[in-house]
Amino acid sequence: MISQGWWYLARASGIVAWLVLTASILWGIVLSTKAFPRRRRPAWLLDLHRWLGGLTIGLVALHVVAILADSYTPIGLVDVAVPFVSPWRPVAVGLGVVAMWALLTVQVTSLAMRRLPRRIWHGVHLVSYGTFALGTLHAVLAGTDRGAMLFQVTGVIAVLVTAWAVVYRLAHRTPVRRAVPRTVTRPPAEIGTSDPAL
């Protein structure tokens, strides 16, 4: 009975983690558009994005703990840390492991955002899109709820909305402005004076 409880917890935490990750990515895309200008944007909007990311990490951790505690699948500690070595559905589990490490990398660099060059932070942050794709594949290939109608409908809606948001963001992104060197103009020399540089 206890083992069955762990299995239900593993399934529920995995699905909710994926949904919260979806919400975090969508909210991040909204913040990067002109809907909320940075100068007028309340601090809680960015805090909500960070909170969703942290909540996703917590739910993934709960998902992993429940998987390890459950006896339904022969998955051990190494299997949830090293990709594609699990004896049970190695590809599906491996995709989830890669998504987990990618998610942790994004979260750690976000916490250290002020200490990193913006270009590096932004490049790592783009991994979030790949994390969503890997998490989706993991849920479809490894999830035992993939046959449920509610799961299928929710999954299709989440994927379509996220895909549309990503395409919209890429199509309306603001080009990076490059600094243009200023041309220094020297005042003309007065009549009767000599310029040593000439």
Q: Each PLM stretch: what is its role?
A:
Residues M1-L198:
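Membrane-embedded alpha-helical bundles that constitute the cytochrome b-like, heme-associated redox core
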